[in-house]
Amino acid sequence: MIDEMAEKPGAIAKMVAWQKEHISDRQMTLILAFVIGLLASVAGFFLHSIVHEIQILLTSGFEKSTYNLLFLLFPIVGIYLTSLFIKYVVRDNISHGITRVLYAISTKQSKLKGHNCWSSVVASGITIGFGGSVGAEAPIVLTGSAIGSNLGQIFRMDKKTMILLVGCGASAAIAGIFKAPIAGLVFTLEVLMVDLSMASLLPILISCVTATCFSYILMGEKSLFDFTLTDPWELDRVPACILLGVFCGFVSLYFMRAMSACEGFFAQLKQYPYVKLLFGGIILSSLIFLFPSLYGEGYSAVNILLKGRTEADWDMVMSNSLFYGHSQLLVLYIGLVTFTKVFATSATNGSGGCGGTFAPSLFIGGFAGFFFARIWNIYKLGVYIPEQNFTLMGMAGVMTGVMHAPLTGIFLIAELTGGYLLFIPLMIVCISSLLTISIFESHSIYALRLAREGKLLTHHIDKAALTLMGMQSVVEKDYHPVSPDLPMGKLVSEISRSNNNFLPVVNQAGVLLGIIDITRIRHIIFRSELYKRFKVKQLMLQPSAVLSDHEPMQEVMKKFDETDAAQLPVVDVNGVLKGYISRTRLYSTYRQIVADMSAE
């Protein structure tokens, strides 16, 4: 769509032409960084407004002291409306927002579709507003990244700048939605794997600061989480902080494994959309009815734990539930909510809703931290630890474990709450959590799927270069296939027209049967008495290796190293020949990408 716009004569094409003539790409990148920050903050404000207004409309009349049967209805309605919107308006898959951004960077030259600039905002707004137990952050990250990608496509930026603009959009989304510019910056570094050099640092900072400033203008100065530090950190709480980090690591592992299992279950129902909607909707509605804290993002419930000072304050987290008024069940309620949140999130997305796992990880972390502190204090396992502080540190710990992003966890929580006085315990918890989860999972919840497919862009420059190459950039099509029944005399004629040292042998369906290695038959090709005696099928060899057209480039490079071949054929899933890759072109393309990535 963007390419077509740029090709058509008109205002946009003229603007791009004027820019190329009068403004350097470096200057234009800085301008676009500002625009991306502005638009990302507006998108975040719009999404939160949708969610807030829908929730006020639906739940403002609920009595806190009694349960409400409408909790059984609202989530199903929201998921159904979202499914209709995606099916008939968007007509594309917009789930897994951050994973989709990572996929675009590694395999699609950072190109995201135009509808991603708005579709996730609307879909997730409906889902969360009606009670879907997911987060708004991943849809906003996808939206911000799509804004950066589409602006980059309009102004025809190069591949490296496209990655940078996508990173600007993602960082602006996080910075704007949380009013946390440093967290937005390190999120791009840790989660999206965008390398920061002096050339890329400035545009991302511009986007983060711009998004933060406009978020203050649009949404006021109030922080997303209301926290006041009344009990400063003390050195004798270090053992508790370490144990909390380990606990958060195991909670993160449970979250990731349970999410993966639930996604697999709902994927099996893909052919039965209404069954999937009904089944997931019933699970979600039932959980929200039992535990209303699971309604929507759940940040209001986390704020109750952060602001509370007494049992009476914390009991408010059980409002609208069957547990309300039974303060002795508070710890049980907190534990059950922590355990069931992952199923509520999975049911929301699996049944057709739209949302991310960013907010659920913060929610689970907050509840897990409070649960840990209450158990510790009730059974007097050591020195007293303040529940509010450990709720905050639990949020950082679980987010670190789920995203493998300790700096994001530390700076986000510190910026959100102004809790810089808790910097050291935050670091202890995040490090302990990351060390624990890393024993079992080497990738974040966003990168896990791509890592298994060999499509994950990392900070390792060699692996990143291979990921960015892509199979299509090195496959050559200038081959001359021959039939297995072709006489040797005609084969010699084909050899004279070929510029390669091998000819692929294919059947009538185009399926690869073998190859003719010219270097192996050079000693007989001039013996005319053999021309009618031999056919291609008697002379062909099996290639030392065959490449799949969807094979990760790391595996392609490995096969060339193992076989020492000059060329290797490429086939599709049915064995049909699609071309070949030459060692010369492979290494030439690789060296060029490494040089581009290393250049400032």
Language-model features, listed with the residues they occupy:
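Alpha-helical transmembrane segments and immediately membrane-proximal extracytoplasmic
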Residues: 1-468, 472-478, 482-513, 567, ...
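Post-kinase regulatory C-tail/linker adjacent to protein kinase catalytic domains
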Residues: 453, 536, 597-600
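The conserved cystathionine-beta-synthase
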Residues: 482-499, 506, 525-528, 546-573, ...
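Short hydrophobic beta-strand motif reused across regulatory alpha/beta modules
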Residues: 513-521, 580-587
